[in-house]
Regions:
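Generic helix N-cap/helix-start motif at coil->alpha-helix transitions
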Residues: 126-128, 160-167
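Conserved alpha-helical positions within TPR/SEL1-like repeat arrays
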Residues: 1-4, 27-38, 61-72, 95-105, ...
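Non-catalytic membrane-proximal stalk/linker segments that position and tether the catalytic domains
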Residues: 141-157, 166-233
Length: 234
């Protein structure tokens, strides 16, 4: 699609033309809203999502997207209602659980955020992004089954770099909680190496960072952004 190609303004015009032909095209309203949201036109995105829902009140994806737009406008109560509406319509809507978890975490409601991530993983246990998000609000204990599951996931050969990065950081956090210093630094370094590769970041800027962290061994929440939850997504 034009949006996937990064041609956002052209995508907006394309959706508007489609809606001129068929104003009751709920999916086009939703897609227009998603594109406007990407363009940071959040108020306009809300209006598009609302139009989609006026046509199809049971459109779970539009409820989820509306929740995201409300959250980006700092309308957190409305956002929560929208995420809950999406989940009432589709109790296995992983993105809605993940998005609601991210919002609740940002609001400091960590137990509720943890429950959202756990619910999402119960549906999609191989989702590396959600494993990472859960790791940001969880304190790992010996014998944790999620820890074992993440270790098994990381051995799979078909992981893309993004999934591997998420699992490395999630497992690094788990090893930190468990006091496994060497494994913590090994996985932290592996995740950062992959992320630098993904971002095309000059490696020479980080030649000494691993040894520096190992010497200090202080809480990573104060020195790197690796454990911050990922942003919500449509």
């Amino acid at each position: 699609t034009l949006k996937e190609l990064g041609k956002l303004e052209e995508a907006v015009e394309s959706y508007k033309k489609a809606l001129n032909i068929n104003p009751d095209y709920a999916e086009a309203h939703n897609n227009l809203g998603s594109t406007l949201e990407t363009l940071t036109q959040y108020t306009e995105a809300v209006e598009s999502y609302k139009k989609a829902l006026n046509i199809d009140p049971d459109y779970a994806e539009a409820h989820n997207n509306l929740g995201q737009a409300f959250y980006l406008l700092n309308l957190t109560d409305k956002a929560l209602d929208s995420f809950e509406n999406a989940l009432a319509l589709n109790p296995e809507f992983v993105d809605a659980y993940n998005n609601m978890g991210g919002m609740l975490q940002d609001l400091g409601r960590l137990d509720e955020a943890l429950n959202c991530y756990v619910s999402a993983l119960a549906i999609e246990p191989d989702d590396a992004e959600i494993h990472r998000n859960l790791s940001t609000v969880k304190n790992y204990k010996p014998g944790d089954t999620q820890f074992d599951y993440m270790q098994a996931l990381l051995t799979k050969n078909n992981l893309n770099d993004s999934d591997r990065i998420n699992l490395c950081f999630a497992l690094a956090k788990a090893h930190e909680d468990l006091g496994n210093k060497d494994d913590f630094f090994k996985l932290l370094n592996a995740g950062n190496e992959l992320r630098r590769k993904e971002l095309n970041y000059p490696i020479e800027k980080n030649l000494n960072i691993h040894s520096l962290y190992k010497d200090l061994f202080i809480s990573t929440t104060n020195i790197i952004p690796a454990y911050e939850p990922l942003t919500i997504k449509p």
